[in-house]
Amino acid sequence: MAYIAVPAVVDSRSSEAIGLLESFGVDAGADANDVSYQDHDYVLDQLQYMLDGYEAGDVIDALVHKNWLHHSVYCLLPPKSQLLEYWKSNPSVIPDNVDRRLRKRLMLKKDLRKDDEYNQLARAFKISDVYAPLISSTTSPMTMIQNLNQGEIVYTTTDRVIGARILLYAPRKYYASTLSFTMTKCIIPFGKEVGRVPHSRFNVGTFPSIATPKCFVMSGVDIESIPNEFIKLFYQRVKSVHANILNDISPQIVSDMINRKRLRVHTPSDRRAAQLMHLPYHVKRGASHVDVYKVDVVDVLLEVVDVADGLRNVSRKLTMHTVPVCILEMLGIEIADYCIRQEDGMFTDWFLLLTMLSDGLTDRRTHCQYLINPSSVPPDVILNISITGFINRHTIDVMPDIYDFVKPIGAVLPKGSFKSTIMRVLDSISILGVQIMPRAHVVDSDEVGEQMEPTFEHAVMEIYKGIAGVDSLDDLIKWVLNSDLIPHDDRLGQLFQAFLPLAKDLLAPMARKFYDNSMSEGRLLTFAHADSELLNANYFGHLLRLKIPYITEVNLMIRKNREGGELFQLVLSYLYKMYATSAQPKWFGSLLRLLICPWLHMEKLIGEADPASTSAEIGWHIPREQLMQDGWCGCEDGFIPYVSIRAPRLVMEELMEKNWGQYHAQVIVTDQLVVGEPRRVSAKAVIKGNHLPVKLVSRFACFTLTAKYEMRLSCGHSTGRGAAYNARLAFRSDLA
C-alpha cells in the first residue's frame, strides 16, 4: 500500500481522485478500483485554526510526521463538570480506573450538588488520571502527531488539534454552547461510526509525510501555482526543510504501478520509488558507472646498476610490488635506465612517490624483503636502476572496509619516514581542479610537543641526563648507544620507564586539547610516531599504523638541524617504537593509493566533460536568516564544504537525490578572514550523531579524504560576529 501526496483537495469519490491524478499526467485507467482518496479538507481548517496560537513552522513540521496510512482519531472530552454529569446519567460508560468512591457516588440516583463527599472527590478528580495520552491546550503540535501515530484514539480536552478528525465523546449537549469551530467535516457527532483508512493499493492525499511508509510526492509540481494558500505554505516549508527526506515520483511510474506494468525507470527518484515498492525494474547502467576504487596494479622488475670505469654491473635484482598502473602512466615510466638521485644525493621525487605507493620490495635472489638505504654513501646504496619488465597485473580495491565513515585519518609512521618530502610532492598534485592533499590539511604530532615550554623533546633530554648521571648530550648518547649505534637493552629500558610517565602526564593532556581543536577545524590527516600517541589522546578518526620500504634509522642520521642532533633523534625513534602497540603495520602505499589513484581513474572518465555537470560539494548549510541575526550581510546562505566530489553527470544526478540532511553538526563560524582567494572565513564543526557513511557517497564518485572548514564569502561586505549554528549537510552542484 502506497501513499501519493498531491497538492490539491477534491471530493472523496474515487472518480474525482482518478481525475486528480490524470490532471497531473497519470494514466490511471477507467476502472482503477485500487485507488482511494483521503479527504484532507478538514486538515486545512485545523491548520488555519492552529496558526492562531502556534508558529507555522512548528505546526507544519509536526504535520509532516503524520502517518496517513495509520487510522487514528481525536476523542474530545467535555469539561470536567459535564463529564461527571454524563457519567452520572450513563454509569455503564464510567471507566474502570476511576476512583472507586467517586464511581459509587456517581451511581447513586440522587442530586449530588449538596453531597460534600462527592464535591470533595470531584475537586480532586483529574481527567489526565483516567485518559492517557491526553491532549490539552498546552500540548505541542509534535506531541499531538506522535500520539496519533502510536494509537487509534487520542483523548483531548481542546479542539485546537491537528492531523485527525475529532470524535465527540458525549452527546452535543454536554459541551459548551459553541465549539471553537463546528464544521461538520472536522467534528464527528457522538455515536457516529468513524471511517477507517481504506486498504487500497494506492492512497491519494494532500499532505506528504516522512512517517508514512512508501510515501511519494508527485514530481513536477509548481509550488507557486498552488491556489490554496495553506497548501502552498505547507509545500514551501516541506520542500525547503524536508526535501532530502521525501521521495518524488513521476506520473509515468505512477501510471505503470496502477496499471500493473513493468516499471520504466529513467531517473534516480523513480528507481528509489521502485525499490520502496519492491517492484521489479531494469536500469541499464551507462559507461559512467565505473568503480573508480578498483585499481589495476603490477609488479615492477628492476635492477640496481653500478657503472664503474665504463663497465655496467648489476649488483641486485629487485621486485617492487603492487605499483598502480595509473601512476606508471602519469610518471611515464617504461622499460629503460633511470638515475634516481638528485645532485645533492637525495632521491628524485618520482622515485620516492613510486616506492611509497608500492607494497615494498623483494630481493629476487634471496626472496627476502628489501629495504632501501637512503644514504648516498656506499656500500649498498642505489644510484641508478634499470626497469626490465612488468608482471602480475591484477586489480585491487583501494577502499578497504576500514574506511566505513568519512572521518579524519591518523597515519602512524616511524621517525625518518620522509613525511615532509612526500607531503611536498602530494601538495603539488592537482587533478580535475582538486588538490589531492594540501599541506594545510596535514597535522604532525610533533606540533604538540613543540607547543610546550620547554619542548617535550628538550624536557625528555634533560630528564635522561639525570638518569644517566651525565651533564652533556654527547655523554648521554654514549651511555645509551654502543659503537655500532645499537642501544644497550637495559639502559634503553631505563629510559623507556621514564618515558611512559612523561608521555602520560605531559604529552597526553596537551595532545587531547590539540586534537580536539584540530579535528574541529577540519577532516585533517594527522601524522604520529606511535599509535599510542593518538589512542591516549582520544583520537576518533581512522587509525592506520604504516611502514615504508626504507631504512628509517639511516634517514634519521642524514637529517640535520633536529632537536638534540641526529643521534638523540635515533634514541627517540627507538623509544617511540617501544611506545607503539603491537598492531601489525600496513604499507604506506595503501593510504597513498586511496588518495591518488581513484582521481586519476576519474580523470580518464570525465576529463573532457563540463566541470559544472561533474563537480559538487557536500557541506554544512546555514540559512542566511540565521547569519543575518549575527550581523552577516545575508547575500547568500552560509555553506562550509565538507566533501568535494567529482563524478560523471549521471552519478551526480543520483547523488543529488540522496538524503544528506540527516547528518548534522554544530558549526562555529568565526570572523577571522583566511589569507588568499577566494575570500573566506575560518570555521569549526563538531559532528552530532553519526558520521557520513562512505558508501553513501558511492563507489562511482571521487571524494576528498581531507577538508579544512571555511565559509566562502561571495561579496566584499564586512564580516559578522562569530557564532554557533546547528547545521545540516546539503548537496550543492550546478545541476541543482
Swiss-Prot record:
> What family does the database annotate?
Belongs to the orthoreovirus mu-2 protein family.
Q: Which InterPro entries match?
A: Reovirus_Mu2 (IPR012494)
Instruction: Give the organism, scientific name.
Output: Reovirus type 1 (strain Lang)
Localized where?
Virion; Host cytoplasm, Host cytoskeleton
**Documented effect of changing K419A:** Loss of ATPase activity. No effect on microtubules association
Supply the name of the protein: Microtubule-associated protein mu-2
Example of a GO biological process term: symbiont-mediated suppression of host JAK-STAT cascade via inhibition of host IRF9 activity
Disulfide topology = none
What is any one of the record's Gene Ontology cellular component terms? viral capsid
Keyword DNA-binding in annotation: no
Cofactor(s) this protein cannot do without: a divalent metal cation
Q: Which Pfam families match?
A: Reovirus_Mu2
Q: Which GO terms describe its molecular function?
A: structural molecule activity
Q: How does it assemble?
A: Interacts with protein mu-NS; in viral inclusions. Interacts with polymerase lambda-3; this interaction stimulates the ATPase activity of mu-2.
Q: Which domain of life is it from?
A: Viruses
| UniProt function note | Minor inner capsid (core) component. Displays NTPase and RNA 5'-triphosphatase (RTPase) activities. ATP is the preferred substrate for hydrolysis. May function as a cofactor of polymerase lambda-3. Associates with microtubules and plays a role in the formation, structural organization and morphology of viral inclusions, where the assembly of cores and the replication of viral RNA occur. Together with mu-NS, recruits the other core proteins to these inclusions.
Keyword annotations of the record: Capsid protein, Host cytoplasm, Host cytoskeleton, Host-virus interaction, Inhibition of host innate immune response by virus, Inhibition of host interferon signaling pathway by virus, Inhibition of host IRF9 by virus, Interferon antiviral system evasion, Viral immunoevasion, Virion
